[in-house]
């Protein structure tokens, strides 16, 4: 469950997260343990998905860690330099670990983000499907 919400928060932009938070219960106060700070990470790849690993290149990542007043710690790593996104994601990660807050935050923030991501993926798949070539059909047309 945590892996899912951390992934959704990492892929959403700060404006979208903030808009969803406007409809959610107020987040608890927090203090920053680390960052937000931006750095580089080496990305690795594998030829064909299962070949020998190689260094593909570096990418920019922003990370943040926060602690809520009840002691719960939240973390976030996001691609790019958006410090606001990293901090919002870390605070939400910490808040979502509380079983009392989780249902309201899932309904107000995480589920709408998941639905938007699923719709975006479906649109992209439909767009790609429109350009698909059926080689069997081409062979029978000759």
Enumerate the language-model features and the residues they cover:
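Residues in flexible loops and secondary-structure boundaries
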Residues: 17, 39-41, 50-51, 69, ...
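Short capping/connector residues at structural and topological boundaries
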Residues: 47, 59-61, 83, 118, ...
């Amino acid at each position: 469950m945590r892996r899912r919400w951390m992934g959704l928060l990492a892929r959403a932009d700060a404006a979208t997260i903030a808009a969803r938070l406007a409809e959610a219960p107020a987040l608890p106060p927090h203090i920053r343990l680390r960052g937000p700070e931006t750095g580089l990470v080496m990305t690795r790849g594998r030829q064909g998905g299962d070949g020998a690993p190689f260094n593909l290149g570096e990418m920019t990542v922003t990370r943040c860690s926060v602690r809520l007043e009840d002691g719960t710690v939240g973390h976030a790593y996001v691609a790019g330099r958006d410090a606001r996104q990293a901090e919002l994601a870390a605070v939400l990660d910490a808040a979502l670990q509380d079983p009392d807050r989780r249902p309201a935050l899932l309904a107000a923030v995480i589920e709408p983000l998941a639905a938007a991501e699923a719709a975006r993926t479906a649109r992209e798949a439909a767009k790609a499907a429109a350009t698909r070539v059926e080689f069997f059909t081409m062979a029978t047309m000759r």
